[in-house]
A protein has these predicted regions:
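Formylglycine-dependent sulfatase
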Residues: 1-268
Length: 268
C-alpha cells in the first residue's frame, strides 16, 4: 500500500496483508485519473477494501467511484492474488476460471496444477512444501501464472493503443509456492546457489526483530541446507520465466507503436 499511496505504513494504516486501506487514502490512480490516464491492474495487489468505512460514508463498493476505491484506485483488468491450498476460493480468480476452461480438473486448479507437482504414483505434491520445490509444476508452461498474466497484459496493451494509460503489471511470482514448470524447473540446481553468508553473532546478538524472524518457521526452513537447495533453484527459475515473459510485453509495445512512448518502472 505504500507503493500505491506514496506514504509510510504508519501513515496509511494498512500494516499487514488483509489490513484494509482506509477509505480516503489517495492512491496512484487518484492522481492520474484527473489527467486522463487510465490506471489499470493486471495481477496481484493484496489490497483489502475498507468496507466498513465505505458503508459509513454511503459508498457502493460495486460500482462507479466505489469500485475504484475498493480496488486501491485501479480499474481491474485481471486480479490474481493466489488461492489458499485447501479448496477453491469463495470468489474464484479469473485465472482459476481460465484453468478450468482449459480442462484442468479439480475445485482448485491454481493449487492442484499450477502450484503442485506430480508424484511417481500420480499423487499431488503441493508446492507449498519446500521439499517439493525441486519438482516441476504439473501445468503446461504456457498456462502457468506468469505467462497467463503476461497474455492478459498484452491484451490490454493491444486493445488500448490510442489511450493514455498506466498498467500495473504485478506478477505474483516469484512467491510462495516456489514451484515452476519445465523448462525452468531444470534450469538451475544446487550448484548455482550461492553459499549463505552467516555469522554466529547474528544469532547470539540478534536484535529482538531479527530474533523473532529466526523463530519463524520459514526462517528455520531456509536455515536447512537441503531445503535451500530445493527452493532457491526454483526461485531462480521463476525469475528467469519473468525475464522471458517481459520480452513478450516489450514486443507487444513495439508492435503496437507504443515502445517509444512508454515509461517502464520496475518495483519489487
Amino acid at each position: 500500500m505504500s507503493f500505491y499511496t506514496g506514504r509510510y505504513v504508519r501513515s496509511h494504516g494498512s500494516t499487514w496483508n488483509s489490513f484494509p486501506l482506509r477509505v480516503g487514502e489517495m492512491t496512484l490512480g487518484d492522481h492520474l485519473r484527473p489527467l486522463g490516464v487510465r490506471t489499470v491492474l493486471c495481477g496481484k495487489t493484496h489490497m483489502r477494501a475498507d468496507l466498513e468505512g465505505m458503508e459509513r460514508l454511503g459508498i457502493d463498493p460495486t460500482g462507479g467511484i466505489g469500485a475504484l476505491v475498493a480496488e486501491c484506485g485501479f480499474e481491474v483488468w485481471d486480479r490474481n492474488d493466489g488461492v489458499v491450498p485447501d479448496g477453491a476460493a469463495k470468489n474464484p480468480s479469473q485465472y482459476n476460471r481460465h484453468l478450468s476452461a482449459q480442462g484442468y480438473e479439480g475445485a482448485n486448479p491454481w493449487h492442484d496444477w499450477a502450484n503442485s507437482a506430480e508424484g511417481e504414483s500420480g499423487e499431488i505434491k503441493s508446492g507449498w512444501l519446500i521439499e517439493n520445490n525441486h519438482l516441476p509444476a504439473r501445468i503446461a508452461e504456457e498456462d502457468s501464472e506468469t505467462p497467463y498474466t503476461t497474455s492478459r497484459a498484452i491484451e490490454f496493451i493491444t486493445q488500448n493503443t490510442q489511450d493514455s494509460w498506466c498498467l500495473h503489471l504485478s506478477y505474483i511470482k516469484p512467491h510462495w509456492p516456489y514451484i515452476v514448470p519445465e523448462p525452468y524447473a531444470s534450469m538451475y540446481g544446487p550448484e548455482d546457489v550461492p553459499p549463505p553468508i552467516r555469522s554466529e553473532d547474528e544469532r547470539s546478538k540478534a536484535s529482538p526483530i531479527l530474533a523473532a524472524h529466526h523463530a519463524k518457521r520459514s526462517a528455520q526452513f531456509f536455515a536447512r541446507e537441503k531445503l535451500r537447495e530445493k527452493a532457491i533453484p526454483a526461485y531462480m527459475g521463476l525469475i528467469k520465466q519473468i525475464d522471458d515473459q517481459l520480452g513478450r510485453v516489450y514486443d507487444a509495445l513495439k508492435e503496437t507503436g507504443q515502445w517509444e512512448d512508454t515509461l517502464i518502472v520496475f518495483t519489487s
